[in-house]
Regions:
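Single conserved hydrophobic/aromatic residue that forms the stacking wall/gate
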Residues: 1-9, 13
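Conserved ABC ATPase "signature" region
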Residues: 55-73
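Conserved ABC ATPase signature
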Residues: 78-82, 86
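Conserved catalytic motifs of ABC-family nucleotide-binding domains
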Residues: 99
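Catalytic Walker B motif of ABC-type/P-loop ATPase nucleotide-binding domains
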Residues: 103-106
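A short, surface-exposed alpha-helical micro-motif characterized by mixed small hydrophobic
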Residues: 145-147
């Protein structure tokens, strides 16, 4: 069989070295991905193996570090002295420094506090908008997915069971629950309000969008 990646229709098996730099992956546990003496060296590993000049490597390292919120003083520390959130950002910086066409993130917010989660998700959204590349987010957090995903692939026992726009997938809440998943909590609350006769539209997936809709409604009812 022939496996193709992107519209260039390159044969993956014949051009493995070139293809490796088209896809970057951040593991769920970044400490397994970090290995160099300093954060700077860790981030520079990918660009170095791409054959970039030292000047280009330095540029990519600092671009990736700035993008992920890694301060200059952290670049020369051991990655193993970082906090959990800092390790996560360092691991992501090391991958995006290669400027991959496809960025794969495996449970990127696992173990982060609410603030760290919000910051990381915002960075992922901004990265996608600025670079206009493909970002694949592997997650069991429906709230995270609702915030960042345009389309959702649902797998069950290694089989594809759904592939559609985010709102359309979450509209199939009963089917999701049967395979052990759930719709975002706020979406479920809005669904319950509709069942009680409140004129609430479908497709509200985040707390922010729920507040935007309900606040004028509540003010009107309070008069």
């Amino acid at each position: 069989s022939t496996l193709m990646l992107s519209s260039a229709a390159s044969d993956v098996y014949k051009r493995q070295r070139k293809i490796r730099f088209k896809v970057g992956m951040v593991f769920q546990y970044p400490e397994y991905q970090l290995f160099e003496e300093t954060v700077y060296k860790d981030i520079s590993f990918g660009p170095f193996n791409k054959g970039l000049s030292q000047e280009e490597i330095d540029k990519e390292v600092r671009r990736a570090a700035k993008f992920t919120g890694i301060k200059d003083e952290l670049l020369y520390k051991s990655p193993f002295d970082l906090s959990g959130g800092e390790k996560r950002r360092a691991a992501i910086a090391g991958v995006i420094a290669m400027d991959p066409d496809v960025l794969v993130l495996d449970e990127p917010t696992a173990g982060l506090d609410p603030m760290g989660r919000d910051v990381l998700l915002s960075q992922i959204v901004r990265y996608h908008k600025e670079r206009q590349n493909t970002v694949l987010l592997v997650s069991h957090s429906m709230e995270d997915i609702a915030r960042v995903a345009d389309r959702i692939v649902v797998m069950n026992k290694s089989k594809l069971v759904m592939f559609d726009e985010t709102q359309k997938v979450f509209a199939r809440g009963d089917e999701l629950e049967k395979i052990g998943l759930r719709i975002p909590q706020i979406t479920k609350i809005m669904s319950q309000l509709r069942k009680r006769g409140v004129d609430v539209p479908e497709g509200i997936l985040t707390v922010d969008s729920a507040v935007d809709y309900l606040l004028p409604f509540i003010k009107k009812e309070a008069r």
